[in-house]
Design a protein with these regions (language model features):
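C-terminal helical "tail/cap" subdomain of flavin- and related membrane-associated enzymes
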Residues: 110-201
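Generic detection of long, well-ordered alpha-helical segments
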Residues: 27-35, 102, 124, 153, ...
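Noncatalytic linker/hinge segments flanking ATPase motor cores
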Residues: 19-24, 45-62, 105, 121-128, ...
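Short linear sequence elements within intrinsically disordered, low-complexity coil regions
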Residues: 9-12, 22-25, 67, 129-132, ...
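Short secondary-structure transition/capping segments
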Residues: 21-31, 95-98, 161-175
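Conserved FAD-binding catalytic core of PHBH/FMO-like flavoproteins
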Residues: 1-63
Length: 201
């Protein structure tokens, strides 16, 4: 696994996330796939308490899916407004699902409130435009995250190290979008030339 996350849940429970190459998916197939995942975490030398994770008992489901984006250009039609995953979702590598949904709810509810106050039909164009740009920025952020976190081999490791040093030195890039919100970064953080400079050899 090139990228993994461990989330303590309280009461001695953990939620584990791991990324693996499609070529390795058979390693996590079959009825014992949960035990295989726990075993993979146990082999991570960099993970504190890896032995304790290996000795744990799986209690939840094992879900595996490919990381990708899905969206529609206009999540509205007469009498209907789609929000959250129904309107399209971001590659889960940067964990934005709930944040996207909550922002959608806020924007749509404000439009509905304002239309009711003005006794007029709601105009969802601002929501459609804002969401399109937000999702575009998150799509770019997820693509960079995938390149840095989930590509495999020595070249990928070297690229991660270079990019990490550049980010630590203050070089502009899109990675903070998943922490502070994509709208809070300047537009140039998402320009192709910015990404190229961040990932360059």
């Amino acid at each position: 696994m090139a990228h993994f996350l461990v989330f303590p849940q309280g009461n001695d429970l953990l939620r584990l996330y791991g990324s693996y190459h499609f070529a390795d998916k058979s390693h996590f197939d079959g009825p014992d796939r949960r035990a295989k995942l726990i075993g993979a975490f146990g082999k991570l030398n960099c993970l504190p308490y890896a032995a304790a994770i290996t000795a744990s008992t799986p209690v939840g489901p094992f879900n595996s899916f490919s990381n990708e984006d899905h969206w529609i250009d206009d999540p509205t039609c007469p009498g209907v407004v789609l929000i959250g995953d129904a309107a399209g979702h971001n590659d889960p590598i940067i964990g934005q699902g709930l944040s996207i949904s909550l922002r959608d709810v806020r924007l749509v509810s404000e439009i509905l409130r304002d239309a009711k106050t003005a006794a007029s039909e709601p105009d969802f164009r601002p929501y459609v435009e804002e969401r399109a740009e937000r999702m575009r920025r998150l799509r770019i952020t997820a693509q960079v995250a995938t390149t840095l976190r989930v590509e495999f081999g020595s070249e990928a490791r070297e690229r991660r190290a270079r990019a990490g040093k550049r980010v630590a030195a203050g070089q502009l890039g899109p990675m903070l979008a998943s922490l502070v919100g994509p709208e809070r970064l300047p537009a140039e953080a998402f320009f192709p030339e910015t990404i190229e400079k961040l990932l360059a050899s």
